[in-house]
Amino acid sequence: MIQQSHAIGPRPGSVRGLLLSLVCLALCACTGLPEGVEPVQDFQPERYLGKWYEIARLDHSFERGLTRVTAEYSRRDDGGIRVLNRGYNAEKGEWDQAEGKAYFVRGDEEGYLKVSFFGPFYGAYVVFGLDRENYRYSFVSGPDRSYLWLLARTPTVDRAVIDRFVTVAGSLGYPTDELIFVDQESGP
């Protein structure tokens, strides 16, 4: 008679399953909405496509030192959105750019997307404020309150747009006193 031995501890499959669950949880957390921030409804993706200028942002290493920052959005063949971010790096004397892809999280009538610049890793892109009449400016958040942008169709905006952005973002708990206003004139 052959006796079966039983290993003590978790089965290898269960550890693998746990690790996979943790990775999935981490990835989902990056595409979640910051608490209390609601994406705009009745979003019109075709009107959002095109070039946007970064007017203000919170600081992040991937944009640090860049001027003349823009984001350009166009349709992908798979129905998603192609994202091309570009900025001038004066220290290097050259343009930096990153290309990514974005997909709507809950349907294209809501300004809530997930965007990736690196493989399977996505972050939230939440349009929570928008000039609905002309799509001239947009208030954008990432997965938490450390990501915040004011985008516009032109390199400058009226002071009233900036004031509204600061007021709305501040009321939602964003650290608006840390905003960087992007130089859209320096560089080549």
Where are these regions (language model features)?
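Bacterial N-terminal signal peptides
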Residues: G17-C28
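A beta-rich soluble binding module of mature secreted/lumenal proteins
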Residues: I2, A29-P188
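Bacterial N-terminal signal peptides that target proteins for export
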Residues: Q3-L19
